[in-house]
Amino acid sequence: MRILVLALLALVPTLSHAAMTAAEFDAYTKGKTFVYGSGGAAYGIEQYLDNRQVRWAFVEGECQEGEWFEQDGMICFVYETEPDSQCWTFERGEKGLIARFENDPEAVELYEVGQSDTPLICLGPDVGV
């Protein structure tokens, strides 16, 4: 009995952080703008629009329009400047989203730093005098 209890307890973290489905991801993100971090620093910002449309910008980078879709249990993105799919798994952690880049499992994990209802402000390239 003790072994069974220990085995079940070992599964608890796995169960609490299951990959989000497309419907769960859409419900959590649509209409919001998220700031993602990595290694204690800001990484990028993504706005989730209607019809699975997105607007992404690296910190201090130009905005890219794109869309997301579900493929094999992952959330995949394509952008106007990067037509190859970039697939991620998203989980709900204690402090928000956790994203793992599945195209390269060795890549750094991203995490939600903040979210708001404010749209992502995109400046055009080479703005200024």
Residue positions per predicted region:
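Sec/Tat signal peptide C-region and signal peptidase I cleavage site
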Residues: 5, 12-19
